[in-house]
Amino acid sequence: MENELDELFARLRVATTPAEIEALQDGIWQLWLATGDQLLDKYLEAGIRALAAGDYTHAITEFTHLIEARPSFAEGWNKRATAYYLRGEYRASLLDVAETLRLEPRHFGALSGWATMLRMLGDQRGSLHVLRRLARLCPHLPGLANQLRDLEDELEG
């Protein structure tokens, strides 16, 4: 799986069209979501369903079971970070984002969420730093150049 991820990320760095970027990101997400274990799939799927239904407490419970069963599964941490964020628990979300990125430093979903939270919390410089890190992974991500320019203008102005 790691070689496949490396290949997809190498292609993502040079992808220029939105359709190509989306297809590569979808391929990466598929690999990130693969647990290879029925019980872990059950936790993951139940958590995703709870997220979609707006039941963030239940989602956090399911993702916590997943994390306890396999702490090395980065997507469990990322999904729980999302649930914490949606529940307004930004500190807990940021801690899970940090663990996601420790396990998978290229996690563009976690980077994007981190940048959003930092900006929302008033840390424009931190958000800019994270967005620049994201730009190294996917320089042509739709909307990213505008976000970077807006933040740079805001910080200079």
Give the ranges of each region predicted by the language model.
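Alpha-solenoid helical repeat scaffolds
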Residues: 9, 26-29, 64, 98, ...
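Alpha-helical adaptor scaffolds
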Residues: 37-104, 109
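Terminal, low-structured helical/coil segments at or just beyond the last alpha-helical repeat
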Residues: 3, 23, 30, 129, ...
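Residue register within tetratricopeptide repeats
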Residues: 19-22, 57, 91, 125
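TPR-adjacent "capping" and linker segments in tetratricopeptide-repeat scaffold/adaptor proteins
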Residues: 1, 29-42
